[in-house]
Design a protein with these regions (language model features):
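Eukaryotic scaffold repeat domains enriched in small/polar residues
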Residues: 4, 10-215
């Protein structure tokens, strides 16, 4: 096959252009892409480091290793009582929440049995259990809860990823969220005098629930 002079010139010109383009691309420094960063979600210290509930001279806490609830004298630090609940607490994970209602009722989440248990604050004796009419889903719930005035509860549930308010009867009163983040470690509660603050740090969400709905 033979080429005319014009075709040879065009072919050589094409090779020359490709060479220049290749050299330019080889020497060109890669452009750095700016990766947007998100500021940490502002959580109050009381939500990250919650204070153990206290009633009079007694401070209540949980022992995750022994799976018990304890009451200590706030002055001396003496162990007043230790309780295993109705028929022992099943705590398969990190969640073992405890709360004292505005009415002075001590409630503990037996998450493995998917219920709340009420203990006598003075003796640790089991008094009653509570669970919603529609049982908690997942393996172990609720992972966060607050006992409201009048026997109501607000809960945060993993797996089903819900924030709900329940009546004393167990009936659902209000559903605040159905799309919490996947990890329970992003769920936080901060208890103030009249309001409970609930947070999902991963989704940067915040809810406020009054302790007394009628107040």
């Amino acid at each position: 096959m033979t080429f005319s002079n014009r075709e040879r010139r065009l072919f050589l010109a094409g090779l020359f252009a490709l060479g220049i383009l290749g050299a330019f691309l080889f020497r060109r420094k890669p452009r750095l892409r700016a990766i947007p960063t998100q500021k940490p979600f502002p959580l109050p210290d009381a939500a990250v480091h919650p204070v153990d509930p206290q009633l009079g001279a007694l401070r209540f806490s949980v022992d995750r290793k022994k799976k018990t609830v304890c009451a200590h004298d706030v002055t001396t630090g003496r162990l007043v009582w230790e309780s295993s609940g109705e028929d022992r607490f099943i705590i398969p994970g990190a969640a073992f929440p405890i709360d004292l209602s505005p009415d002075g009722e001590l409630w503990v989440a037996n998450v493995g049995r998917k219920r709340l248990e009420r203990l006598d604050p003075q003796t640790g004796r089991f008094i009653a259990s509570w669970q919603p009419t529609e049982p908690f889903g997942g393996c172990c719930n609720p992972v966060r809860f607050a006992a409201l005035a009048g026997g109501r509860f607000v809960t945060m549930e993993k797996g089903t990823r819900r924030v709900r308010i329940y009546a004393p009867s167990g009936a659902l009163e209000q559903e605040l969220a159905t799309d919490l983040s996947l990890s329970e470690h992003d769920y936080y509660l901060d208890r103030e005098k009249r309001v409970v603050h609930l947070y999902d740090a991963a989704r940067r969400s915040h809810w406020k629930v009054r302790y007394d709905f009628d107040a």
